[in-house]
Amino acid sequence: MRRYRSVLFLLAVPLLALLACRQEKAAVTTISAQPPEKYVALTFDDGPWPGTTECLLDGLAERDVKATFFLIGEQIGAMEDTVRRMAEEGHQIGNHTYTHMDLSRGDAAERLHEVEETDALLTELLGEGTYWLRPPWGFMAEETAREISVPMVYWSLDTEDWRRLDADEVEREILDNVRDGDIILMHDPYATSVEAALRAIDELRGQGYRFVTLEELFARKGVEPRPGTLYIRPDEVKSSSADQ
């Protein structure tokens, strides 16, 4: 009887091991294929601004998100540390003229000086680089555009955050209208814009969106940005730089 029990035990051991193996395999979760990632660029105009710009940088750092900041030259001097922080944390920095000048009006030499003065400030502070230009209000005289040696950027999704001044409304504008490849226009002087941007990031990440700088967005879309060209999106160029 003992011999039979021993035989049964020896037969049972491999069977139990086989069952355990089967149970372990059954517990493995099958991961379905994920949809392709969608890329968008958050861009912020009219900074740097005391308080709100630092708050925005804190929120972006917590989320490991990179954005693009178009800076007004006359505001840089009082916030050089903030501008350095932008660069150190991997954000792209661009030119928004020295005084937020309408580049479709006034003297041609003055228009060009507005761009060159801010470019010189950024170069002195951060070193040589290609500081893309966003013309204030998107206006640019053809004569001036021909003198610009860097890419120029408009936007494809205008949140109108400067007018709404309501975080819920601004966030909803983004969530309802965003699509892959968008360039989103916001303004970091407004606390409501900062709140809306961070909330939109949290929501859209769950929908497969990634937030990148303009340079990375163009690279991801396989577009080589051309100097003096005004882009609405990587795949869309503004037909006439002077259009208003």
What are these regions (language model features)?
Residues 24-106, 110-117, 121, 128-129, ...:
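Active-site beta->alpha N-cap acidic-glycine motif
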Residues 1-42, 58-68, 180-244:
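Terminal accessory/targeting
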Residues 55, 101-210, 215-232:
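Catalytic domains of cell-wall/extracellular-matrix polysaccharide-remodeling enzymes
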Residues 17, 94, 153:
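Conserved Rossmann-like nucleotide-binding pocket used by diverse enzymes
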Residues 6, 25-29, 88, 163, ...:
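Sparse, context-dependent recognition of short Cys/His-centered cofactor- or disulfide-binding micro-motifs
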Residues 8, 49-50, 165, 192:
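A generic signature of intrinsically disordered, low-complexity regions enriched in glycine/proline
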